[in-house]
Amino acid sequence: MSELTPSDLAFAVADPTRLRLLVLLHTSRRELCVCELTTSLDLDQPKISRHLKALRERGVLSTRRDGQWIHYRLDPQLPLWAIDVLRGFADGTTGQTPYVDDAARLAHAGCAP
């Protein structure tokens, strides 16, 4: 995978669902599985999986498999400028719907080992 470009990151944040996923992964500061993400965003699994695939293909997310579970996280090789952009989006969405609701649902989602 080549290095993340500004247009890759623009694609990632251009869709509201992808932005919600990225904000949640950034603010949670941990890996999340698909079931945690579907519960948190209150969306169906195929929609979440489609967006996760797009983010992974662009180099924004990385995965770790643990048996049947696939855990997603922001790619640890993201350039600093990209992390700063994601931090800006996370800061800009603080206290806003649906982001606050996503975080509240995540606090009660405990499906992965």
What are these regions (language model features)?
Residues 2-44, 69-78:
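N-terminal helix-turn-helix DNA-binding core of bacterial DNA-binding proteins
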Residues 39, 50, 56-57:
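Alpha-helical residues within the helix-turn-helix
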Residues 18, 50-51:
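Histidine-centered divalent metal-coordination motifs
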Residues 1-4, 80-113:
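Amphipathic alpha-helical dimerization/coiled-coil segments
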